[in-house]
Regions:
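Terminal targeting signals and extreme-terminal segments of soluble enzymes
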Residues: 1-224
């Protein structure tokens, strides 16, 4: 592993500043933070990944995702995120972790072979909503985290750029968009951007993510 870090005091930074005119394209679907917090925004559904220590998606259980009902395009994943623990806030130090936490893009292209795509996340979120209304809170995945997926996605290389320091008390809500620029021969080039509640850019990341097909991993283990 090779890591290069360039640090600076952003609060003391001074220099030329201009409005570039850059915006998200397509624009994000409108959301009300108060409605999201109350799980009543008609355009978004909440989804929390059930935790199980043997699940390869267990790390996502620390964040509650809000997924739009409307699907932009298959190569885009939009989410509002908030800590699963109501006593926690997102801090600047957590941004590197959050930038590696997007729900999987490739699963959008394989809806019949995976449970991580947007359609599956919406369906799971609606089931969780029914459970909440019935007074059922599922925090453990009883099936050993057996999420269906054709492959495991790895971060081979990652660059992270912090554009804004979060407040010292942290942030309860952030918006994240992940989008693939190319998916070819088992390699995905993608970018992730994080915004605060006012949709001001906080951080961005470029990533190269190879995919390892689970069937190939199983075959390799059997040969050992």
């Amino acid at each position: 592993m090779i890591s290069l870090v360039n640090m600076a005091n952003m609060q003391a930074s001074r220099g030329l500043t201009f409005e570039s005119g850059w915006k998200l394209d397509p624009p994000t679907i409108e959301a009300s933070i108060s409605s999201l917090a109350a799980d009543c925004d008609p355009r978004w559904v909440s989804y929390q990944t059930p935790y199980h220590p043997e699940s390869f998606r267990r790390v996502q259980s620390y964040v509650k995702f809000y997924v739009p009902y409307e699907l932009h395009q298959s190569h885009i994943r939009d989410h509002w995120i908030t800590p699963a623990d109501s006593g926690v806030s997102f801090t600047t130090e957590m941004l590197g972790f959050l930038l590696d936490l997007s729900l999987p893009i490739i699963d959008n292209y394989l809806p019949n072979e995976s449970t991580g795509g947007q359609i599956a996340s919406i369906a799971a979120g609606l089931e969780q909503e029914k459970d909440r209304e019935a007074g059922i809170a599922k925090v453990i995945d009883p099936s050993s985290g057996a999420f269906e997926s054709p492959a495991v996605y790895l971060s081979l290389s990652t660059t992270i750029e912090i554009q804004k320091i979060l407040l010292a008390r942290g942030a309860k809500w952030l918006f994240m968009r992940a989008y693939a620029k190319q998916i070819k021969n088992g390699r995905m080039s993608m970018e992730l951007v994080i915004f605060d509640e006012s949709l001001e850019l906080v951080a961005l990341s470029q990533q190269l993510c190879p995919s390892v097909e689970l069937s190939r991993m199983k075959t390799s283990k059997e040969r050992l």
